[in-house]
Amino acid sequence: MARITNMGKRKRFLEATPYESKVLEQPKNSSNTNEESSSQDNMKASFGSSKRYDERQKKKRSEYRRLRRINQRNRDKFCFACRQQGHIVQDCPEAKDNVSICFRCGSKEHSLNACSKKGPLKFAKCFICHENGHLSGQCEQNPKGLYPKGGCCKFCSSVHHLAKDCDQVNKDDVSFGHVVGVAGTTGADEDVYHEYAKTVAAPTKKRPVKPVKKLVTF
């Protein structure tokens, strides 16, 4: 059996054309986007700088308040050695050589309050008359005596001793009363007023003696 085919011309395909790349065009609103991004960056930078500025201001205010509290505490202090405000005896520049020793016996192991001996203060130096043998509180040239902030003994108006050490008060007729002090006004060297109230001995009432019953026996 024979087969007949159509023997036509051979089909030809088109040749491939070369690929041409085109440059992408930028959108028209690209300038707007750049402006928006730059404005956002500026806002972030300004916000960060303002935040840092606020933190610096807070630190400055905190430091100012701290220094103000220190100055307030120093104003309330009073030195019993040089009679000046702003420091206490332990920090006094004029009394640095003598504060660490006992004014009575000269020992460096204890202070005057802990000394067991009795006698004059040989190692003490007065900061008013600059003489040895007494403290500035007992100096006759000191008008304030033991009361650097003012005041006197409540019984004899003397400034050379405290009210509890006054000789005009007979301790046999005096009972220890309550301690009177104003909070916030007394300093480390200020005398706190010890009030001793005189008590009048009230007559004691005698109880009536009951008569003893007598037993009569028959």
UniProtKB/Swiss-Prot annotation:
Domain of life: Eukaryota
Zinc finger boundaries on the chain: CCHC-type: 77-94, 100-117, 124-141, 152-168
Transmembrane region(s): none
Residue ranges with Low complexity bias: 29-39
Short name of any one Pfam family annotated for the protein: zf-CCHC
Compositionally biased tracts (Basic residues): 58-67
Keyword annotations: Metal-binding, Repeat, Zinc, Zinc-finger
Chain intervals with Polar residues compositional bias: 40-49
Gene3D superfamilies given in the database record: Zinc finger, CCHC-type
Molecular function, one GO term: nucleic acid binding
Region Disordered: start-end pairs: 1-67
GO cellular component: nucleolus
Protein name listed in UniProt: Uncharacterized protein C683.02c
Phylogenetic placement of the source organism: Eukaryota, Fungi, Dikarya, Ascomycota, Taphrinomycotina
